[in-house]
Amino acid sequence: MAGNGKDKEVDKSPSVSTLKLLGKRLFNSSSHTDNSSLLLSAEQLGNGRSLRKRPTSPSISGSGSGGNSPSSSAGARQRSASLHRRKNNASVGFSNGSVSSHKSSVALQDLIKHNNNPYLNSPSDILGTGTGIASTRDRDRAVLDREKEKERARNKERNTHHAGLPQRSNSMASHHFPNENIVYNPYGISPNHARPDTAFADTLNTNKENDLSFYMHDGNSKIRMLPLPIANPNDFLPEDMKQYSVHLTDNFVFDTDNKPIGSGGSSEVRKVKSSYRQKDVYALKKLNMIYHESPEKFYKRCSKEFIIAKHLSHNVHITNTFYLLKVPTTTYTTRGWGFIMELGVKDLFQLMERTGWKNVPFNEKYCLFKQVAQGIKFCHDNGIAHRDLKPENVLISKEGICKLTDFGISDWYHVIPHDYTSPVKTCQGMIGSPPYTPPEVMYFDAKKHYPEKFQKPYNPLAMDSYALGIMLITMINNIIPFIDSCNTDARFREFEVSYDNFINHQNPHFRDKGCHKPGPGSEYSLARNFKNTDATRIAWRLADPNPATRYTMDDLFNDPFFQQIETCVEPNDDDLVRVPELRKSTSTNDFSENSLDAPHDQEVIHTSNPFLKKETLTSKPRSMLEIAESPSLKQKSKVKDSAKTKTHDVGDEGGNESTKPKQQDKKENLKKDEVKNGDKDKVIEEATTTNVDSILEKPTPTSTKVEDNLSEDDSTMKELKSMLNSTPTTPTHNGPTPLPAKAGTQLDKRMSDLSLKSETPASTKNFSAPNVSSSSNSLRSLGSPSVSSSKKKKVIHHHLDITNSVTNMSSVSAFISR
């Protein structure tokens, strides 16, 4: 068949040319071409009138006339059925601009529906004649317009300062390109790769976790960022709390682990180290903007929390807060403010959720409870209500001491702050954390839908007392008593019924002030595990649903059972926590950029404790300008050193030594030799004097007598020095320098009269008085000024040695790095 001439004509079939011709007619026609002309063209094409040679081509007209020619039946090859179907489907009849075939019409509409054509919403009809396609496009455009209107309405409801900004389209299909030039966008054209905002990060699309905004903040798109520039913390702090440095990176570095040790709705906690002592690790509490908070409100809220925490930091049961610093944007955190705080080992909740907590003795649990109560009492004594007390906000130090933290919603409870004679300021609104929030506060919970007649102002001090009682019940029962402290919780209703039944049938005076009769017994579910009715009295009185009869902190500390609880730490003990150093400051507002230059005429030793007086250096090095103005001024200063004890002139250090006569040099050399011979005598004298001073300052059982003797005879130390200097001897290299016999006898007598003892290490030191401390905080208590011979022995508690059989608990996964 290859040699047949007719077959060659079949091979030269101009089907491609026919399709090109049809395409040119479609695109060159007007937008409203008459359908009859198109139908005619199709018929002409189908009948083969426009073809040069197509004797074997079948008719593609829809009428069925004009079948195969006689020449095609003579030697034409057979056509496959699929080819016939394909050619028959190509028979197009344009009626109203739509495809006549039902199947092809459905396929085309489905293709348009899922197509992402950027020119789909163009105002000019690129396809020309199609009205069906345009109608589908109009419907899609209407749907997208409605979605954009809804998005604009949601942005207005957010009430942010950038809500009125033009919103980006959600897809390329909804964007218009009529008169726009294509501009390079480094952030991509995908709506998920939204351009990061300088003020807010919550407007970013979170459909994909790996968008560009993930690298611009902590990974949580709900975190809002402060606008630049970040305010100076010193502008919001009182004069006695202003800081030498306000930048985090000046004196601190992030921990290499780069793992947060805690996070909440308004903050995140990470580890930082001192730039000068890598062993000194602290906690950085990075503060975040919440809800619809403006930057000004954020600064006021954070500065208020810092002032309250700083004001309470001089107590052993309060977590020390050192500095309020500006945090830059790094790979660890976003820009903003942050606190430098004392780092805790664990929190109380982590201890309570351990499997070995149920086996902890009651006296150790009561010890922890009393420590928390002492911290709350200290806050109330200083005019501050915590208002968010819960086990998660009680940190445990490495010595096993409970420390309160998180003063984010704390407030002064007096009408006039710092005026303790002013009345108590009541509060309104829902604050705190259920179930530690009392019933009078739960009435303000919008989710409970309580009527306004129940929403009355409440006392914030009673709120702390209730939380303390629920915490004690949780510590003893190893489970939270109820979820919410309101009548919508079945277990709380059961607690209220039990409370009323105990008062009505067993102890009618249970709520009376000063009544210390036994509390509920084992017949009540929330009192069964106490094993002590006096302990249940404390817990139930603190958790009284009625705030009018609830235990106050004064009532608690007057309770006989509470007074008998032994603790391993006293509230007046010193808390030896190293204060981080601030050696460098890059702030240009209030301080010099050079950390070595003092901000005033006298060098100031900056301290983080506002209650300590600032120490000033008595002498300041002269500048080159002062030396040039008064070169003849000579300031004599004595330099005390173990190797050099000569007197020199400050004014002679500028190169005048080279012009001295040789005779004067010889005299000075002779003086130096004499000084060297007497160096060891003076070293012994200074060491002995230092030892005497240190021993006199340390507490002893007879420290009162020592102070009396010193007050009556102020020349005691002068006599000791004179005895040492009476007969100096030449030191030898074979052994220590012997003291004169007379001087030694007098010194021994004087030392025995003053009951002085030689200083020995704390580990081998034996006191004549009873042991003052042997607990986990013994290193901090030894040598404390509060130690006296009449003080009772402290108990030994190992609060951090609670066993845990579960190695990885989901609830503490964020705290494993501690």
Curated annotation (Swiss-Prot):
Compositionally biased residues, Basic and acidic residues: 136-160, 638-651, 659-685
Xref: SUPFAM superfamilies: Protein kinase-like (PK-like) (SSF56112)
Main location: nucleus
Sites of Phosphothreonine modification: T56, T700, T737
Any GO CC annotation of this UniProt entry: cytoplasm
Active-site residues, Swiss-Prot/TrEMBL: D388
The protein's name in its UniProt record: Serine/threonine-protein kinase PTK2/STK2
